[in-house]
Swiss-Prot record:
UniProt domain TRAM: residue ranges: 370-430
Broad EC category: transferase
Catalytic activity: N(6)-dimethylallyladenosine(37) in tRNA + (sulfur carrier)-SH + AH2 + 2 S-adenosyl-L-methionine = 2-methylsulfanyl-N(6)-dimethylallyladenosine(37) in tRNA + (sulfur carrier)-H + 5'-deoxyadenosine + L-methionine + A + S-adenosyl-L-homocysteine + 2 H(+)
Gene (name only): miaB
Keyword set includes Transferase: yes
Organism: Thermodesulfovibrio yellowstonii (strain ATCC 51303 / DSM 11347 / YP87)
Gene3D superfamilies: Methylthiotransferase, N-terminal domain, tm_1862 like domain
UniProt xrefs under SMART domains: Elp3 (SM00729)
The protein, known as: tRNA-2-methylthio-N(6)-dimethylallyladenosine synthase
Binding, [4Fe-4S] cluster 2: C154, C158, C161
């Protein structure tokens, strides 16, 4: 290819965000620069999400807006990557022939061959058992905090989820590769790392499980904060809780998806735990780490969710009092077991239940944040927001707007002067 400009649009989770960083890293080694508009690009990449219908609709809408660019520039390459690409590869090409290439999550490395015109076909969706051993270059969006993949794929097969079909079976990265990557990040001045996986608790390389991996990362000089996402509740162990309590770099925050408060629904979801078992683990966490922030995911309107099942989810929110949640209406995904269940809930009922869940959680979050007024929080400064204010995050992952002008990467103590539903404000008291 002669042109060397790339535009990339990312949909979905942190794994996708990091996959986009890796694609940009590959292209960067070939002299590509990232541009902010598709019309300026020689390659347009859509890194897609298939977890919900809404994410797919956003992708198709964005894709439709670049179709005309092909007529103006026949050399333009349009690449669809990510989970929708994996699920619908051939179907997408047949339906939308102006797409040039389809790349699944296990095959990001083929972008190098594509730009060098060294490929003989257009669809790259084969499962790659070696994906955990391939260390790709990364062009990171941030200079303070970084994502680091530790495990790929998922073995849980929750009935509503396409991830095992789009990202394959679990494959853990070699521990030495992870430590080497994080050590390099520390040398480059990064202060925080987030360990990524569909289920980080399943990490296993030889004798190193996830708690032992955290211990190794803790020892890397220069890294000040460690986070991880996502944890499956069934695999949350007391060993992990003890490590979180004992090691000061591990932030006091965990994202632990509940999904529903009804045992009937949890069983239909194939979550492999009961609400009582989940709540016991919440108690472990809060007993060991009293100030821990716990966030979660909730799905409303799952097939066969009766009013009493939904009420159990409402009661769970009241009992647990999460710091925040991501809540969604159930979205049937083609090929999943849940899509084939009887008793699907109407869109009207799902919408009403979602509103009720979000309203309740907003009240809980607002009250919890209010308690932080006048308290001192350690904040890692991340940069400026759209209004020009200095912003950062607490160890509990709460966004803080800081009145003073401090450079990114500094860790400061902030006295919280004002709280909002989704953010805090305050003044620096020491650096």
């Amino acid at each position: 290819m002669k042109g060397r400009a790339v535009y990339i649009k990312t949909f979905g989770c942190q794994m996708n965000e990091h996959d986009s960083e890796r694609m940009l890293g590959i292209l960067g080694t070939k002299g590509f620069i990232e541009v902010d508009e598709p019309k300026k690009a020689d390659i347009v990449i859509f890194n897609t999400c298939a977890i919900r219908h809404k994410a797919e609709q956003k992708f198709f809408s964005s894709l439709g807006r670049v179709k005309h660019l092909k007529k103006k520039n026949p050399q333009l390459k349009i690449i669809v990557a990510g989970c929708s690409a994996q699920l619908q590869g051939e179907k997408l090409l047949n339906k939308l022939p102006y797409i040039d290439y389809i790349i699944g999550p296990d095959n990001l490395h083929v972008i190098e061959n594509i730009i060098e015109n060294q490929v003989s076909h257009r669809i790259f969706t084969d499962e790659n058992p070696e994906v955990a051993n391939i260390n790709l270059p990364v062009k990171r969006k941030d200079c303070v905090k970084a994502w680091v993949n530790i495990i790929y794929g998922c073995n849980n097969y929750c009935t509503y989820c396409v991830v095992p079909y789009t990202r394959g079976k679990e494959r853990s990265r070699p521990v030495d590769d992870i430590i080497k990557e994080i050590s390099l990040l520390a040398e480059q001045g990064y202060k925080e790392v987030t360990l990524l996986g569909q289920n980080v608790n399943s990490y296993k390389d030889g004798n190193t499980n996830f708690p032992l991996l955290l211990e190794k990362v803790e020892k890397i000089e220069g890294i000040k904060r460690i986070r991880f996402i996502t944890s499956h509740p069934k695999d949350l162990s007391k060993e992990l809780v003890d490590v979180m309590k004992d090691y000061k770099k591990i932030c006091e925050h965990i994202h632990l998806p509940l999904q529903a408060g009804s045992n009937k629904i949890l069983k239909l979801m194939n979550r492999k735990y009961t609400y009582e078992e989940y709540f016991e683990k919440i108690c472990w966490l809060r007993e060991a780490i009293p100030d821990i922030a716990i966030t979660s995911d909730i799905i409303v309107g799952f097939p066969q969710e009766q009013h009493e099942d939904f009420e159990k989810t409402i009661n769970a929110l009241k009992e647990i009092r999460f710091d925040g949640i991501f809540a969604f209406k159930f979205s049937p995904r083609l090929g999943t077991a849940a899509a084939k269940l009887d008793g699907h809930i109407s869109e009207e009922v799902k919408a009403a239940r979602l509103i009720e869940v979000l309203k309740l959680q907003d009240e809980i979050t607002e009250r919890k944040n209010k308690r932080l007024e006048g308290k001192i929080q350690e904040v890692l400064v991340e940069g400026k927001d759209e209004e020009g204010f200095t912003t950062g995050k607490t160890r509990t992952n709460k966004v803080v707007k800081i009145y003073s002008d401090i450079k990114a990467g500094e860790i400061v103590n902030v006295k919280i002067a004002k709280t909002h539903r989704h953010s805090l404000e305050g003044d620096i008291i020491s650096t």
